[in-house]
Amino acid sequence: AIDEAEDRERFDELLERCNIPRAPGRTVFNLDEALAAAEEIGLPVLMRPSYVLGGQNMIVAYNKADIIEYMGVITEHVDMDHPVLLDKYIMGTECEVDAICDGENFLIPGIMEQVERTGVHSGDSICVYPAQHLTQDEIDTMVDYTGRFARELHVTGLVNVQYAVSHGRVYVIEVNPRSSRTVPYISKVTGVPMVDMAVRCCLGEKLTDMGYGTGLHPNAPYVAVKVPVFSFEKLHAVDTQFGPEMKSTGEVLGIAPNYHDALLKGLIGAGYTFKTPGPGSCCIFTVKDSDKPCLLYTSPSPRDVDESRM
């Protein structure tokens, strides 16, 4: 199952059998193949080696220079017996699902939504349970796709699936037939003992006999926000830019009746400080050029943004 999820050709065959869409992608072994694939798919593209954890050696390439630099580094330091994976980068909302499977049925304790854009490693993104900005159709689609993966891969135990949602369509980013770093978080905030249940499934018990039901577990009556913690102030000469490679060294949890308060608790717990705004207060946004058009739609008062300084 692990090889089927990690090997690009076998994974594409799995998606075809399950009738599940994914971003266009190719496998490449050298620079010429990478440039040709990027031209065919269209920039930007997500590039990563096969069989990696923590987003190691992954980048989002926005131009040919990025591809040339990446392939030069990767072919020098990585075993090229396995190909480099090159996928179309989809800008959207990233979501994550951890599920327990007994070989027939599956249980999803909850769907998690990442605050940061797709392309930022999920371990470095603020994570929200339950998802705040998904439609019911998108939720139902994720539950359906997760069940198809669990059955087709014959998973007994835990499986992790990462999704990207763009313009109402759900795409699969990757499937990991194993435990993930979000299992302790989602177990704690939902009250579903995932590890205990997964072990019982491996020993032959059925989910229907464990008292938590199957499919998607009902949402808790509160919001839980996981905020990453970084150690940049202790590590010198470290690239602080977020991307597909994980850089956080810890995390904190904020729980409250609503999203706003849970997020505020989490940020304060992670060491951020906030001052109560007074008359004439302003907020300074530091945004790269390619993201500036989005700023007008995400700032609290778009009409108050000084576009002359953009």
Region locations from a protein language model:
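ATP-dependent carboxylate activation and anion-phosphoryl transfer catalytic cores
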Residues: 1-5, 9, 14-18, 41-44, ...
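Short acidic active-site motifs
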Residues: 33
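Short acidic-hydrophobic, aromatic-tinged amphipathic segments that line or gate anion-handling sites
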Residues: 26-29, 61
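Conserved small/polar residues in nucleotide/adenosyl-binding loops
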Residues: 297-304
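A short, GP-enriched loop/loop-strand-helix hinge that lies immediately N-terminal to
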Residues: 1-5, 21-26, 299
